[in-house]
Amino acid sequence: MPVRPARCYKRIKGPPYTREEYIHGAPMIQIPKFDMGTTSAAARAAFPLVAKLVVQERGQIRMQALEAARQMAYKYLSKYVGDANYYLRLEAVPHHVLRENRMLAMAGADRLQEGMRLAFGSPAGRAARVEAGQVIFYAEFKPEHVAHMKEALRRASTKLPLPTRIVIEAKGDGGGKAATQG
């Protein structure tokens, strides 16, 4: 069956559904890498700037959207900056299991399904629940790559269903005012 549109799962409804020991057939998290670029702490000490992709609304982001955004940012940075010149981390983890009450839409389907009887739904995917102000992507880089980092995060944000903003600041200035916003 095809994947439902993101608008079906964008809003948070009800409590999180995360307990895998009670969920039979819960899909695996299909994001192979959460850390990209230069991952060693010694090499990351040379990166003085930090960029963050921050979500502006509360909602859910499916794992397909997170993976598409990760691939867009990773491919752009690998091509134009080089893997040795940045560190990129995906912060949002899709723990919430999405359910779907599949409805058949063909001739004779009324004899095959139960309609709204026992309509709890079966596991259909996963999503990350995010709050306003939460960081989706975190990146460290050198000052000469500011334009490329902004473009990579902008491209990643086009794959996400919620509005986002880019915050660039000096490393270690976590609570201070942002240097640049895009």
Swiss-Prot record:
Q: Which InterPro entries match?
A: Ribosomal_uL16 (IPR047873), Ribosomal_uL16_arc (IPR022981), Ribosomal_uL16_CS_euk_arc (IPR018255), Ribosomal_uL16_dom (IPR016180), Ribosomal_uL16_euk_arch (IPR001197), Ribosomal_uL16_sf (IPR036920)
Q: Name one Pfam family in it.
A: Ribosomal_L16
Q: Which GO terms describe its molecular function?
A: structural constituent of ribosome
Any one GO CC term of the record: ribosome
Which GO terms are recorded in the biological process aspect for this UniProt protein?
Answer: translation
What species is this protein from?
Answer: Pyrobaculum neutrophilum (strain DSM 2338 / JCM 9278 / NBRC 100436 / V24Sta)
Concerning Gene3D superfamilies, the annotation shows: Ribosomal protein L10e/L16
Q: What is this protein called?
A: Large ribosomal subunit protein uL16
* UniProt entry keywords in alphabetical sequence: Ribonucleoprotein, Ribosomal protein
Does the record's keyword annotation contain Ribosomal protein?
yes
Family statement: Belongs to the universal ribosomal protein uL16 family.
Q: Which PANTHER family does its entry note?
A: 60S RIBOSOMAL PROTEIN L10 (PTHR11726)
Q: Tell me which SUPFAM superfamilies the record gives.
A: Ribosomal protein L16p/L10e
Its domain of life reads: Archaea
